Amino acid sequence: MMIRNQLYRKCIIGGGRSILNGWVINGTVPNIGLRYLRSGIVTRSNEIKTLEDLSKLKNLDDVDPELIRKLINERTSELNIQNEMEMLKHIQNEERKTQDIPIKRFIRPTWMFLLMSSTFYLLGHYIWWKLEYDEVEKELDRQVTALEEELHNLIEEHRVHGENEAIKNKKHKHWYKFWS
C-alpha cells in the first residue's frame, strides 16, 4: 500500500515515470502496474551498478533518477580522484626534474671556467717569471759592472806598477844594452 501511495505522489507531482501515466486510476495504481514496476525497476536497479550498465539500456524512462544521480556522482568522484592523482604525479615529476639538475647544464660553464682560470694562471705565472728574470738580470748586471770596475782598477794598477818597474828597469839598464 505504501508503494502505491509513493508512486501515486510521483505521478501527480510530475516526478513519476512515463510507465505510470496511463495506469493511475482514481488516485490508485492497479496491481498490474505495481507488479510491472516491481519487476522492472527493482530488478533493473539491482542490475544497474555502473554507468556502463546504464548505457546498455535502450530507454532511461524506467530508471530511478536518484540511481542515475548516484552513479554519475560516483563516477565523477572517481574521475576527480584520478585527475588529482595524475596531477600529484605530474607535480612530483616536475619537482624531481627541478631537483635533479642535469650535469649537461654545467659542462660548458665548467670548461669555460677551467679555460679562463688556466689563462689567468699562465698569464700571472709568465708575469711573475718575467719580473723574476728582470730582477736576476739586474743583479747580474750589477755584478758585471762591479767586476769590470775591479778589472779596470787592476789593469790600471798593473799599468802604473808596470810603468814604475819599467822606469826602474830603465834606470838600471845600461846604455849599451839598448842595442843588444
Curated annotation (Swiss-Prot):
Q: Which residues lie on this side of the membrane: Mitochondrial intermembrane?
A: 129-180
GO cellular component labels: INA complex; mitochondrial inner membrane assembly complex
Which keywords, in A-to-Z order, does the entry hold? Chaperone, Coiled coil, Membrane, Mitochondrion, Mitochondrion inner membrane, Transit peptide, Transmembrane, Transmembrane helix
Q: Where are the transmembrane segments?
A: 106-128
Source organism superkingdom = Eukaryota
Which residues belong to the transit peptide?
A: 1-36
Sections of the chain in a coiled coil? 129-163
Q: Does the keyword Transit peptide apply?
A: yes
Subcellular location per UniProt equals: Mitochondrion inner membrane
- Any single GO BP term: mitochondrial proton-transporting ATP synthase complex assembly
- In this UniProt entry, which residues form the Mitochondrial matrix topological domain(s)? 37-105
Tell me the membrane topology, using the record's own terms: Single-pass membrane protein
Q: What does this protein do?
A: Component of the INA complex (INAC) that promotes the biogenesis of mitochondrial F(1)F(0)-ATP synthase. INAC facilitates the assembly of the peripheral stalk and promotes the assembly of the catalytic F(1)-domain with the membrane-embedded F(0)-domain.
Q: How does it assemble?
A: Component of the inner membrane assembly (INA) complex, composed of INA17 and INA22. Interacts with a subset of F(1)F(0)-ATP synthase subunits of the F(1)-domain and the peripheral stalk.
State the family it belongs to.
Answer: Belongs to the INA17 family.
**What is the protein name for this chain?**
Inner membrane assembly complex subunit 17
What organism does the record attribute this protein to?
Answer: Vanderwaltozyma polyspora (strain ATCC 22028 / DSM 70294 / BCRC 21397 / CBS 2163 / NBRC 10782 / NRRL Y-8283 / UCD 57-17) (Kluyveromyces polysporus)
